[in-house]
């Protein structure tokens, strides 16, 4: 049984002592349990969802946050009856609220399924196709880049160095005539 390696006070490495009882993942041995100081492991795929704050990253703050005042407004001097204004506010708000709930009840799960499949395919292609292709390309282009670099250093560097020396002796003077 291979265990964790420990270092004693003199710096010698030794294997962890074998326990008489207890699970290897959750030891009953108090000394080892204190040393391991177990931490809760969180799986990102099985995390709890927040039913209160359903947009923690604020994805839809500027897009779908539309209230009655954002759509319908009466300027000064053109007001309808107060009862009509209150009834239209209530109608707008309740209709928007319940129609959204109806649409999400009908199409929410199928759309979640479609988007889940889409992002799974996208992740799969990125992991198993795009990144390997890019890595392969970089490996293959490395050979070409070395040949290109040698050609540049062999032919272009001396040419441009010579041109620089030729043009470095040119002096320009600016004179202002009135």
From Swiss-Prot:
Intramembrane parts of the chain: 105-125
Top-level taxon of the source organism: Eukaryota
GO molecular function, one term: molecular adaptor activity
InterPro entries, per the entry: Caveolin, Caveolin_CS
GO cellular component term, pick one: Golgi apparatus
Subcellular location: Golgi apparatus membrane; Cell membrane; Membrane, Caveola; Membrane raft
Record PANTHER family: CAVEOLIN, CAVEOLIN-1
Protein purpose: May act as a positive regulator of T-cell coactivation. May act as a scaffolding protein within caveolar membranes. Interacts directly with G-protein alpha subunits and can functionally regulate their activity.
Quaternary structure, from the entry: Homooligomer.
UniProt-recorded name of the protein: Caveolin-1
């Amino acid at each position: 049984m291979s265990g964790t390696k420990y270092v004693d006070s003199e710096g010698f490495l030794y294997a962890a002592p074998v326990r008489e009882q207890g699970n290897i993942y959750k030891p009953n041995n108090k000394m080892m349990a204190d040393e391991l100081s177990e931490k809760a492991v969180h799986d990102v795929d099985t995390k709890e969802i927040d039913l209160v704050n359903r947009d923690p990253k604020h994805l839809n703050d500027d897009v779908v946050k539309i209230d009655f005042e954002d759509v319908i407004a009466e300027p000064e001097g053109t007001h309808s009856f107060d009862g009509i204004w209150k009834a239209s506010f209530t109608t707008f708000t309740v209709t928007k609220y319940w129609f959204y709930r109806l649409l999400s009840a009908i199409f929410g799960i199928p759309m979640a399924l479609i988007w889940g499949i889409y992002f799974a395919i996208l992740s799969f292609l990125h992991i198993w196709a795009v990144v390997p292709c890019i890595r392969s390309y970089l490996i293959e282009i490395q050979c070409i880049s070395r040949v290109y670099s040698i050609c540049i250093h062999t032919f272009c560097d001396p040419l441009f160095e010579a041109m620089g020396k030729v043009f470095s002796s040119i002096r320009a003077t600016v004179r202002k005539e009135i």
